[in-house]
């Protein structure tokens, strides 16, 4: 089973170099690597799978470092489980780098606002992996080391954007990415994963499909300051799936 790995990148050459080095060191060797520099991000992600030749397509960010058995583990899951359409895993972020992601502003804080956010937005379970909450937000548990305690395959609602693998034939059936997502295109990945799930296939998470996410403040990160686009993306996702 051939695996195509898609890296969408812009303005982060050093991060990209480290990501490619971790791909070079993979124990599984039947890899196709596609580096896509299109903009916006959703267009780059969509172009990647259309160019890919593998039965499995994976999207990783240019600022991740892959565990050496990352590819071997996810391909093994797909080969043994024909009813699985998508696979994801830990996207570990060090506590030092959590500040580089605005969605983790609540971590380590005791304010009433942080407690309210955890209760209302994260359903009171901030360390769960792969779940869409009642209001249509995503649970961030995959970013924390505590997720490594989870054994076996975990059934999930979505796949992590920087560590997402799908059967190419199902991506095609789902129509690929919705190109109407704006800016950094947040939620477009969740959207596609859920479209695949609606085709009748399982989405799973495994601790063996592990990456370290060295969250960068350059490149696409700068566009995350456009809250108008981010909110529009969230509302679009919510309207389609919640």
Where do the PLM segments sit?
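Cell-envelope/extracellular polymer assembly enzymes that use nucleotide-activated donors
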Residues: 2-4, 32, 191
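Short, acidic, metal-binding catalytic loop of nucleotide-sugar glycosyltransferases
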Residues: 21-30
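Glycine-rich, basic loop-to-helix element that forms the pyrophosphate-binding segment
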Residues: 38-52
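Short aromatic/hydrophobic "clamp" motif used to bind/position activated sugar donors
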Residues: 57
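Conserved donor NDP-sugar-binding/catalytic core segment of glycosyltransferases
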Residues: 69-131
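A recurrent flexible, glycine/aromatic-enriched loop bordering the glycosyltransferase active site
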Residues: 124-165
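A short, conserved alpha-helix in the catalytic core of glycosyltransferases
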Residues: 157-166, 170-175, 181-209
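Catalytic core of nucleotide-sugar-dependent glycosyltransferases
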Residues: 186, 208-211, 220-242
